[in-house]
Regions:
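An N-cap/entry alpha-helix motif that binds or orients negatively charged groups
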Residues: 2-52, 116
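A gly/proline- and charged-residue-enriched helix-loop-helix capping module
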Residues: 90-147
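Active-site glycine- and acidic-residue-rich loops that bind
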Residues: 158-170, 198-200, 204, 228-249
Length: 362
């Protein structure tokens, strides 16, 4: 019996989604602070057989938490403690910023989806750096002798920075956060920062990724920090192929696909479309994104083969969804939106489901 969906319907369904998010995040942190997740580590920790090596890093599970839940690195160890094989924080920007005006987070409960126009609200790279360093030290101590959860850091452009100065803004985050990160993500695909998606164009993306790679190498000379780029599902296939070719050319370590979509039509939404239109602009995530996310994954696998890692995200809810992505060529899989609907046992359930699926194939 799954208790959390009932709990969600009673306590969270009628609550402002952003307030519910903060309460839920506080709850996960409290589970760690009072020692519950550590006491139940045997339950939450992924089975050893799920460990996988990607981009030269061993992950305890192929399933992790996508960027967006922990925007500032405040709950990395707590989230790692409930079963995620990796926790990707952010998006972090060079400067602290409040994000877009509220309300900016909306649920489409019937579709198990969310629309957000958060706008990279975060405390900035300078504040996030020490948090990541502390979390990394905690995890290295707590998981000594076993595969520890991995920390990804997702960086983006500060809203007030003009596009012509975007590279330097990304470099502020790069030099501050690379030494603490296990891997780095260049986010050029959020629809909620004006002009950001134009950086996905090859003529803009090439110098940006080149500069970030060089700076990451400079500030971390003794440890290779894998570099990935996160792309939008709204790119046409030809553009995705171009990005894949560029990633191979620049010897990136991976591609994360996909971010949220600005589309509303063709997603099979069952929610009241009048309500959807009233919500307005923002990126849609969750179950309706699954078909396009799978399409992009298969296209990327065809184009890059095993040359780069592919991290698939978008519409992932169940262990079967995760295994489907792995079977389609993903090296790692991420989720976020379903976490809001499924609750704190979600990652543990997925890891247990993956073990059952794999054992059934033997």
């Amino acid at each position: 019996m799954r208790i959390y969906p009932t709990f969600f319907n009673i306590f969270f369904k009628g609550m402002d989604p952003e307030k519910a998010h903060h309460i839920g995040f506080w709850g996960v942190q409290t589970l760690r602070n009072v020692g519950i997740t550590r006491a139940l580590r045997k339950y939450f920790q992924p089975a050893p057989e799920l460990a996988t090596t990607v981009m030269g890093i061993t992950f305890p599970s192929p399933f992790g938490l996508a960027a967006g839940f922990d925007k500032g690195g405040k709950g990395i160890a707590a989230l790692a403690g409930i079963g995620f094989g990796h926790v990707e924080i952010g998006t972090i920007t060079g400067q602290a910023q409040p994000g877009n005006p509220q309300p900016r987070l909306f649920r489409l409960v019937e579709d198990k989806a969310v629309i957000n126009r958060m706008g990279f609200n975060n405390d900035g790279a300078a504040a996030a750096g020490p948090r990541v360093a502390a979390a990394r030290a905690d995890l290295e101590t707590e998981y000594r002798g076993v595969v520890r959860p991995i920390i990804g850091v997702n960086i983006g452009k500060t809203k007030v920075v003009e596009l012509e100065n975007a590279i330097e803004d990304y470099l502020i985050s790069t030099r501050t956060l690379t030494p603490q990160a296990d891997y780095l993500v260049v986010n050029v695909s959020s629809p909620n920062t004006p002009g950001l998606r134009t950086l996905q164009a090859i003529e803009s993306l090439r110098p940006l990724l080149t500069a970030v790679r060089e700076e990451a190498n400079r500030v971390s000379p003794n440890r290779h920090v894998p570099l990935t780029v996160k792309i939008a599902p709204d790119l046409v296939d030809e553009d995705i192929i171009e990005v894949a070719a560029l990633a191979k050319e620049l010897k990136l370590d991976g591609i994360i696909a996909t971010n949220t979509t600005i589309a509303r039509e063709g997603l099979g939404l069952t929610s009241d479309m009048t309500k959807v239109k009233e919500i307005g602009a923002g990126g849609l995530s969750g179950a309706p994104l699954k078909p396009r996310s799978l399409e992009v994954l298969r296209l990327l696998k065809r184009e890059i083969g095993d040359d780069l890692a592919i991290i698939s995200v978008g519409g992932v809810t169940t262990a079967e969804d995760v295994q489907e992505r792995l079977d389609a060529g993903a090296d790692l899989v991420q989720g976020y939106t379903a976490f809001l609907y499924e609750g704190p046992l979600w990652a543990a359930h997925i890891n247990r489901g993956l073990v059952k699926l794999r054992r059934a194939r033997r």
